[in-house]
Curated annotation (Swiss-Prot):
GO BP terms: cell adhesion involved in single-species biofilm formation
Domain of life, per lineage: Bacteria
Gene: ymdF
Ranges annotated as biased composition (Basic and acidic residues): 12-23, 36-45
Residue span of region Disordered: 1-57
InterPro entries recorded: Stress-induced_KGG_rpt (IPR019626)
Name by which UniProt lists this protein: Uncharacterized protein YmdF
Length: 57
């Protein structure tokens, strides 16, 4: 396991970089929820429902 390949894309060993990438991703997202809180709310609900496959409880 000492041979890590493609270090540039490995966030597991570089949490700070992963955090930066997350912030950048949020800023550059195509759908701007700042101007449309209603849409942001709907997206949140959809995301919660469709995550983790089957949870029909």
């Amino acid at each position: 396991m000492a041979n890590h390949r493609g270090g540039s894309g490995n966030f597991a060993e570089d949490r700070e970089r992963a955090s930066e990438a997350g912030k950048k991703g949020g800023q550059h997202s195509g759908g701007n929820f700042k101007n449309d809180p209603q849409r942001a709310s709907e997206a949140g609900k959809k995301g919660g429902k469709s995550s983790h496959g089957k949870s029909d409880n």
